[in-house]
């Protein structure tokens, strides 16, 4: 049986990367929430 997680850098960066987050209003919300919480890493 094939495993479910088959990692690829490009799709990961596109969906969870910083610029990917900045593209949408909700993504920007995520970044701001992580900034407010004081996260060291804001995006993947």
Swiss-Prot record:
Annotated gene: rpmH
Family of this protein: Belongs to the bacterial ribosomal protein bL34 family.
GO MF annotations in UniProt: structural constituent of ribosome
A GO BP entry: translation
Domain of life of the native organism: Bacteria
UniProt-recorded name of the protein: Large ribosomal subunit protein bL34
InterPro entries membership: Ribosomal_bL34, Ribosomal_bL34_CS
Region annotated Disordered, chain positions: 1-26
GO CC annotations, alphabetized: ribonucleoprotein complex; ribosome
Alphabetic keyword roster: Ribonucleoprotein, Ribosomal protein
